[in-house]
Amino acid sequence: MTRIDGRTNDQLRDVTFQLDIAPLAHGSVLVGFGETRVICSAMLEKGVPRWMMHQNVQGGWLTAEYSMLPYSTLQRKSRDISRGKLDGRSSEIQRLIGRSLRAVVDLKKLGQRTLWIDCDVLRADGGTRTASITGACVAVEMAFQRFITAKKLESSPMEKLAAAVSAGIW
C-alpha cells in the first residue's frame, strides 16, 4: 500500500535541518519532516523559576513553548493570545517537548540558568510534535556549543540525544 505522498508504509518522511535560522537565538534550526516545517530555537538566560529557589532545587531549568502559526494549516488557526488561553493540544505538546528534553539534559550542569525552547510551526502537514522534539534537540545542543565556545559552560549538559517519529497503521 502506498500513501498519498507516495511513501511506502515503512518509509519515514524526508528529514531536513537548516541551521542558524534565527541569528539572535543561541541555537536555532528550521526542521522539515516531509512538508511539515518548524522553527526551533533555544535561548539560555540567567535565573531559574521562583519555585526552584523556594524549594532550594540545585541547577537550572528547561521549559518549552509550542505554537502553530495562523497560516500553518489550510484553515487559519487563531493565535492562542487572541483566545486568551493556550489550547489543550498546544499545551500538551509543549509539555511533551519540555519533558523529552529534560530527560536528556543534565540540569545541574546549567547552573542557575533557564533554557527556553521555542517551537513555531510554519507548516503543519503531520508530525509537528515529533519534528519539534527533534529540532529542539538540535537547537539546544547548538546553544550549548556556543556557550562552551564562549567559556560560559565547561561541557555540554546534553547527556543523550532525543529524536522522535510517530507511526500509525490504517
Language model features with spans:
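Glycine-rich, flexible beta-strand/loop modules in the N-terminal catalytic cores of phosphate-handling
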Residues: 21, 29-110
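A structural signal for small-residue-enriched, beta-sheet-centric alpha/beta enzyme cores
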Residues: 88, 108-112, 127-131, 141, ...
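Short, Gly/Pro- and small/polar-rich lid/capping loops
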Residues: 1-25
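Compositionally biased, non-globular sequence tracts
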Residues: 2-7, 81, 153-154
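Conserved mixed alpha/beta catalytic, RNA-binding, or beta-rich assembly cores of soluble enzyme
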Residues: 95, 116-146
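Short, structured patches in soluble enzyme cores that scaffold and shape functional sites
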Residues: 19, 35, 68, 119-121, ...
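Broad gene-expression machinery/nucleic-acid interaction feature
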Residues: 12-16, 26-28, 35-39, 59-63, ...
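Short alpha-helical basic/polar micro-motif
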Residues: 28-29, 134
